[in-house]
Amino acid sequence: MAIKKLGFVAVMTAGLLVLTGCASGPNNGVDQSKVDKAAQALLPAEYLDNGIDVASDIPYEPFEYLDENGDLTGVDVELINLIGQKLGTEIRINDAVFDTIIASLESGTNDIIISSMSDTVERQAKVDFVDYNIGGSQMIVAKGNPENITNPMSLCGKTVIVQNGTIQIDLIGTMSESCKVSGKKEITLTQLPDAPSMQNALRAGQGDAVMMDSFVAQGAAAKAGNGEYFDVVSDPEAPNGYDAGFVGIAILKKDTGLRDAIQAALQSLIDDGQYADLMAKWNMSANAVVSASVNGTKE
């Protein structure tokens, strides 16, 4: 069953997560002992006083999703909560559609994005990224891999499902061009709005594979139908996934003060070990960054 857009705001202060229809007062519940004063000093007053609105496309497990109790969780959720603690301000997570998620910053609906968003040169034209992870793409297929999909060339002539607005669109386009150059049939691309829709389409036989974030693919294969619905295609030529690169928190280019404060807060989490603990908790240590860089992806 596809999960509908949630329409809630998740308010997080000092490690407490509450699902609510509106925010309480600014800075309520902030534990000042966890604040990094140097990072906080970089934060423009409007965000210190009013909090930070965060756009996230939910669900996208293990980055942002609802657990069995209906609580919002995931590595992105926990990380932005820790950043809020370092800055001493309130974090409000707002559900957003991924292919219009940058537009939600431009309209003023949200201030930043944390949604397993790849740091790309194209996106850097509109936003800056504070990079916090290294990720790639992998495929899931129906259990037993009936189409014997093992690598990009085995996708030639097949239908691949991806999410709207993601880097996987260009990735499949490049793979399809390789098929054409090799004299094989091109790949048919199907775009859908979210991870549940993609999984449902694959189960319904509307595609031969889904290309998605590696960690999301692994989680889907392990959990969907208690592990009975999907397999992950593990390509030895791409052990970290296809097109592995930086994943970042996105901030509009004009909001340099907010960007610098978030970068400093993330660096503080790296320095005090909380970031390493978080990545270990979510089995992502191999994908951790060593420092909080801005726009790490280059031409």
Where does each model-flagged region fall?
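Bilobed "Venus flytrap"/periplasmic-binding protein-like clamshell domains
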Residues: 58-61, 72-85, 138-194, 199, ...
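Extracytoplasmic small-molecule ligand-binding "clamshell" domains
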Residues: 29-116
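C-terminal motif of bacterial Sec signal peptides marking the signal peptidase cleavage site
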Residues: 16-21
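Extended ligand-binding regions for polar small-molecule ligands
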Residues: 23, 77-86, 153, 159, ...
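Periplasmic-binding protein-like
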Residues: 58, 134-141, 225-264, 285-299
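Acidic, polar ligand-binding/catalytic clefts
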Residues: 90-154
